[in-house]
């Protein structure tokens, strides 16, 4: 009798798995492991010895990596010159994780700061050009507190942007 196959492959994957196109699968996999704590599930090499697929895991989430295939329209954020998507990564120590990512080659896009919805966040762009918002959940504001914090945060950001524009920064 043939083995019954789970069409959703729930033993390995969740409902949604991100797959990033990268310029160098092995280098990207190494960065995500060292910077964000992913674990390597598999890296598959093609006939030429270059990696054609990688699967990394973090707390039950899978991140797949694949190489650019221009003839199929598959290009990395680095090649595009901008991140076509952002990834939101929850970690226990956001400040440490952001600092580690920067040390390994990511670019910080501003300071790590407490956000109105209760997370402390920092944004980095990884060496492949993808934007990662790294966060630690630090508070659970009520909906009323969240609205108040949002207004305050938006007002302070607007004031900061106006000051930057006035100073020519």
Regions found by a protein language model. Name each.
Residues 128:
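C-terminal catalytic core of tyrosine-transesterase DNA break-rejoin enzymes
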Residues 22-26:
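Short acidic-aromatic low-complexity motifs
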């Amino acid at each position: 009798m043939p083995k019954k196959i789970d069409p959703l492959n729930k033993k390995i994957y969740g409902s949604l798995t991100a797959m990033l196109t990268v310029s160098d699968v092995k280098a990207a996999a190494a960065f995500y492991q060292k910077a964000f704590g992913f674990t390597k599930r598999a890296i598959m090499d093609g006939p030429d010895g270059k990696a054609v697929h990688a699967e990394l895991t973090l707390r039950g989430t899978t991140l797949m990596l694949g190489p650019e295939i221009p003839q199929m329209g598959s290009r990395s954020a680095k090649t595009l010159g901008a991140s076509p998507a952002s990834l939101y990564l929850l970690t226990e120590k956001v400040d440490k994780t952001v600092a580690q990512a920067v040390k390994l080659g990511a670019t910080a896009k501003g300071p790590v700061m407490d956000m109105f919805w209760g997370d402390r966040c920092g944004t980095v762009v990884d060496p492949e050009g993808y934007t990662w918002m790294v966060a630690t959940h630090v508070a659970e504001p009520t909906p009323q507190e969240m609205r108040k914090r949002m207004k305050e945060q938006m007002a302070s950001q607007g004031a900061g942007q106006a000051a930057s524009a006035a100073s020519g920064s």
